[in-house]
Amino acid sequence: MSKYYDEALIPAEMRRTFDVYDRIRALQLPLGSFETDVVSLANAGIAGAVLHDSGLVYLSGTTGGTLPMADDEERIKHGQDGAQKIADTLIKRLHWALRCGGEGDLNDVLYTVKALGMVVSPGGGAFRGAPAVVNGFSFRWHSVFGGPRGDYAQNGLDAGGFAGIHARSALGGFDGRFSIETEIIVAIPSALARDIIQNRGWLFPLPPVMLDKVKALHR
């Protein structure tokens, strides 16, 4: 782990014991490339990620799936698969938000704070499966960062720790031409957050002047 992680104020008993990237490779989760994923914020309506100097990282939501949800096993599986793809997308975004300037990476994630899942489904209590759909997102986070419902858990425990489990809201009754939108907040060491902000700002994608700076360092 990095010096940031090693110096973070978390109990020794709850420190992660594995390299996140080993799990990412085993799960065949694509991380893209610097050239395709580190881009300019010019003309953007929102940021993909915002870093706070406290160490909180807020990731904007993105959508997954193509069908509205219904109380049907096959339809819920479609939503869960879409939710898992959202998790993959946000993990990739977080990777570059932390790494593009050379300051940190996903091994610096201390723990996951809160997720919000919004499910496209009939309202008024007609559909009650929103939590099951959002599990596709949450359990992927468990698999990558550690958690009791991930692919590496046995008998309800992950020997790698609990950094992926999080508080969560899962709500149905939303409209849209997709299945689910999910956003998440994670915690990194405050020292790392401050170094990133001082080096290239608090936004990802990057403002043009900061993108030029990071590209010059990357060459």
How would you label these PLM feature ranges?
Residues M1-K92, W96-L110, G123-R219:
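N-terminal presequence-like segments and the immediate start of the first folded domain
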